[in-house]
């Protein structure tokens, strides 16, 4: 990690952290800085330690929160930690005009941090796997998928991105429970696969992998440490 990225973290007034699956982020942060993340006790949403405020939020919301708070409090140094896939999901949303220019972010994968898994297209056992592999190839009509990553899905077939033919709609965009609905409806799902245990235990098949996911540092674009 460069001194710039290290300074981003150590000079931050507020650091936003995921409130679930915290271990990869705490481990990565401890390996590159001297920051000690305090334990979150009871139902407190934030803790102050050594001049910094630590706030726990949903990991998927970190990019938007960092951009919004930094825009509202320009004199503060706001930094977050999130999965790299949520950063891409947020940034791809900006391409559709949903995000104001002062809500743009930058992110940096933490070097040497362990992979958190990969975003992949998975199919339940009720689906003809080989037929679906052909249908999601570039050049075919986009196949609808159930997902928590609608922007990744919609942009997956565009030039320079993942080159897969999939899409999504609001009724198939969830905040969780993707595999269950995919199984019930006999549809493909686009989701984060960590260890693969859920995929195996529920007889899903991985059709294609879109990207590896790593712990990432999130800042507002143009922020100067």
Predicted regions and their residues:
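Domain-level signature for soluble enzymes in the chorismate/prephenate branch of the shikimate pathway
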Residues: 1-225
């Amino acid at each position: 990690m460069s001194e710039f990225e290290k300074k981003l973290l150590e000079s931050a007034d507020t650091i936003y952290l995921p409130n679930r699956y915290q271990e990869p982020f705490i481990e990565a942060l401890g390996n590159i800085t001297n920051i000690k993340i305090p334990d979150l006790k009871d139902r407190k949403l934030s803790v102050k330690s050594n001049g910094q405020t630590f706030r726990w939020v949903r990991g998927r919301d970190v990019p938007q929160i960092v951009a919004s708070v930094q825009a509202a409090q320009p004199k503060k140094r706001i930094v977050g930690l999130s999965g790299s896939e949520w950063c891409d999901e947020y940034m791809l949303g900006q391409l559709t005009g949903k995000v104001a220019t002062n809500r743009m972010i930058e992110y940096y994968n933490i070097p040497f941090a362990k992979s958190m898994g990969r975003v992949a297209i998975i199919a339940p056992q009720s689906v003809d796997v080989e037929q679906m592999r052909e249908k999601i190839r570039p050049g075919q009509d986009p196949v609808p998928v159930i997902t928590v990553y609608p922007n990744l899905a919609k942009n997956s077939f565009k030039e320079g991105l993942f080159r897969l033919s999939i899409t999504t709609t609001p009724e198939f965009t969830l905040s969780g429970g993707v595999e269950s609905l995919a199984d019930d409806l006999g549809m493909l799902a686009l989701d984060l696969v960590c260890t693969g245990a859920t995929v195996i235990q529920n007889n899903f098949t991985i059709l294609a992998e879109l990207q590896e996911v790593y712990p990432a540092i999130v800042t507002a674009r143009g922020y100067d440490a």
